[in-house]
Each structure stands twice: as C-alpha cells, then as structure tokens.
Design a protein with these regions (language model features):
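Terminal low-complexity tails and localization/encapsulation signals of metabolic enzymes
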Residues: 2-16, 231, 248-250, 270, ...
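Polar, surface-exposed loop/tail segments
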Residues: 198-214, 321-324
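N-terminal helix-loop segment corresponding to the beta1-alpha1 unit
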Residues: 1-187, 191-197, 231, 337
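Active-site-adjacent beta-strand anchor residues
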Residues: 79, 101, 206-209, 257-258
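Aromatic-enriched alpha-helical interface/lid elements that frame and gate functional surfaces
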Residues: 238-313, 320-321, 326
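A short glycine-threonine-serine/GTX helix/turn-capping micro-motif
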Residues: 168-179, 201-203, 234-235, 242-244, ...
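Residue-level detector of beta-strand structural context in well-folded domains
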Residues: 65-67, 204, 245, 335
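Oxidoreductase and adenylate-handling cofactor-binding alpha/beta cores
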Residues: 153, 180-201, 214-226, 267-274
C-alpha cells in the first residue's frame, strides 16, 4: 500500500506532547508530530505568547506564519514563573509523553521544569531541547539565528555560485528546519521506540548547528579524497559545472538545469539544438552556449519543450505559482486550514 505522510495521521495517536517552543524550529517540529496524530498542547506565556503571532503580514488575528506551523494543536497560556502555574504544568507533564522546548540552556532548570523535575514526576517523559549550539560546550549561551548556525556549520561557506563573491543566503531557514526540526522529529520517534523497550524516557539535545553540519557528509568525503578543500562556486553541485545551474529565460524568469549524467546532457543538447564537442573552452564554452540558447525562449516555453526530453530541466517557480502547478495540485500538497 502506498502512503504519504498525510496518510499517517493516526500514527502517533495517543502520544501527548507539551510544546513550550516559539518561532520556527520547535513549532515546525510539533506541527509534524501533530500531523502524524499526536495530541499537541502549545503552552504560551500569558503576555506576548509566541512572537510569531505578531509577524507580518497579519489580519485581525495571529499571523499566517503562526497559524501554518501551529495547525492541529491546542493552545493554553501559562506563566511558569508562577508557583501554581508551574505546578499545573508539572501535573500535565505527568500524563505527557514528550515536552519540546527551545529556550537557552538552563532556562528550563531555572523555571523549575527541567529534565530532573520532569523525570521526577514521570520517568517515561521525553524532553527534546532544540538550541543553536547545544546544551553544553563553549557556545551554549550564545544568541544566534539560522544564518549564524549555517555559518559555523560550513553550509553558508559552501553556498553561492560565485567563488569570488560572498556566500549566498537560501530562501528558507535550512538550519532551523533541516538541522533542527527534522533531526528533532527523528530523535523523538527513535526515543519513543526506545522507551517501548526500556520503559524510560530521555533528554534529547538537538543542536541546529550540528544538524546542519551533518548535511556536509559527502563534502567531507571529498575533503578526504582531494588535495584541496572544496569551495563555493567550484564544485559540481554549487556552480562549478555548466550542466548544473540556473539560466535566465527571455521573460526574465529562470530555468533549472540538472543534466549531470551524459545521457541527460545529450538529451538537453539535442532539445535545444547544441552540438556538444570537446573544445579548448571546456565548461566555460558550454555555459556560454546554454546561456545564449536558453535566453531565446520564455521559461514556460522551455518547460513545455524540455518536458518531452527527460533531461532534468524544470522551471524555477515563485511562491504564488506553487498551488496551481500540476505536480502539487495532483499530489494534494496544498489544502485550506479551517478557521
């Protein structure tokens, strides 16, 4: 039977999660857990709550960003600095399976709801702490954002097509999501399985910097094999190869070209009318030819032409085009969240 993640909406049925996190990484993680059927209760402080509520643009209620990553959750307000409210939270933790937090290290302990306090009430509890640099180490108390985690993970230094220019920022928060939320989801699922075996919970230490650094596994393989360290704009997949890049079309939009393998490059050349011959210019000649020929048609014209040639070329879509694209529409990727 074929399933998608949305088909697994009951996989975590019966798992109770208390979510103390704010902004993006923690709420995105608990959104995944909620989508999988977990009962997620978002716990917010009574005054400001989750700062993402106020992110623009917004209408009369919370921002769209907040509503998206906090779907399928219940919400309560609770002041953990108040003795009675803290006790209320600890009583909730007695019946919970998972607690998620994204404070700086030691904040949970100072509030009286750290792992020892939680474990004292419920030895099966799983506490997942998401932070920029980990719960220990020399950077544990430093403030940071996605750009900083990517910088120290080496991901930012590898990003960008211009070897002589500055690193390029991605369009999404790679460390927050790929380095934090996704690794945390995997760790929680593993901890739940391990608890079935041992009967005991655990404290998960998720560093977004380390999670992002783990994405460089193949690059470190290159470091071991090559005499020089890979740099941005020179590698096969980050701008150094003409057959793997982005090219402007006649309407000012862009086409992604990923014709890495010879068969795909051959099909691309045949489709656009290029004759591939080894020459003194090498890759620079190919880049120049592709730049010139792709600029002769619009993005959508090329998309229609190249779709018939199976050559790993696709249009670069903007956000407002995504819901109506045939791929996402037919797969049911987008759906409305009821008020």
């Amino acid at each position: 039977m074929r399933v998608t993640i949305m088909s697994l909406a009951r996989a975590l049925q019966g798992v109770r999660v208390l979510d103390l996190s704010r902004l993006l990484p923690g709420p995105f993680l608990t959104m995944i857990l909620a989508d999988l059927g977990a009962d997620v209760v978002k716990v917010e402080e009574p005054r400001r709550g989750d700062y993402m509520r106020d992110f623009p643009p917004r209408g009369n209620g919370p921002s769209g960003r907040y509503l998206t990553v906090n779907r399928n959750k219940r919400s309560v307000t609770m002041d953990l600095k108040d003795d009675r409210e803290r006790e209320r939270f600890l009583r909730m933790a007695e019946r919970a399976d998972v607690v998620v937090e994204s404070f700086r290290p030691d904040v949970m302990d100072r509030l009286g709801v750290g792992y020892e306090a939680l474990n004292g009430r419920n030895e099966r509890i799983i506490l997942c702490s998401i932070s920029g640099y980990g719960q220990d180490g020399p950077y544990r108390d430093r403030a940071g954002h996605d750009i900083n985690y990517l910088a120290l993970a080496g991901v930012l230094g590898m990003s960008g097509q211009d070897a002589d220019g500055p690193p390029a920022l991605a369009g999404v928060q790679i460390a927050d999501l790929g380095g934090g939320a996704m690794w945390a989801a995997i760790a929680i699922l593993a901890a739940l399985l391990d608890r079935d075996r041992t009967g005991l919970g655990t404290h998960l230490d998720i560093s977004m910097t380390e999670g992002a650094l783990a994405m460089l596994a193949s690059e470190f393989g290159i470091v071991d094999a090559e005499p020089s360290t890979p740099t941005r704009g020179t590698g096969l997949l980050n701008g150094g190869a003409a057959r793997y890049g982005v090219y402007e079309t006649s309407d000012g939009k862009y086409l992604s070209v990923g014709a890495l393998e010879p068969q795909f490059l051959g099909r691309l050349a045949a489709a656009v009318g290029l004759e591939l011959r080894p020459g003194p210019g090498g890759d620079a000649d190919l880049r120049r030819q592709l730049t010139g020929v792709i600029a002769t048609k619009t993005r959508d014209e090329w998309a229609r032409v190249l779709a018939e040639h199976d050559c790993c070329c696709e249009p670069v879509l903007e956000l407002d085009e995504l819901p109506d694209h045939a791929l996402h529409r037919e797969r049911g990727v987008f759906f409305e969240i009821p008020d």
